[in-house]
Amino acid sequence: MFAGLPSLSHEQQQKAVERIQELMSQGMSSGEAIAQVAGELRANHTGERIVARFEDEDE
């Protein structure tokens, strides 16, 4: 379970996707781009936060 994930509007999600695509077009790997944008979102987000739980289906 992860606490404190930013709750993003559709517009904010779209901007994040566009930022990831921009970084990838500059030669960054997808994983690095996602990690960088996630860090930027966490650092700059001032809205609500959600609690999310991810379960591994292989168990």
Curated annotation (Swiss-Prot):
InterPro entries: UPF0181. Belongs to the UPF0181 family. HAMAP family: UPF0181 (MF_00507). This is UPF0181 protein YoaH.
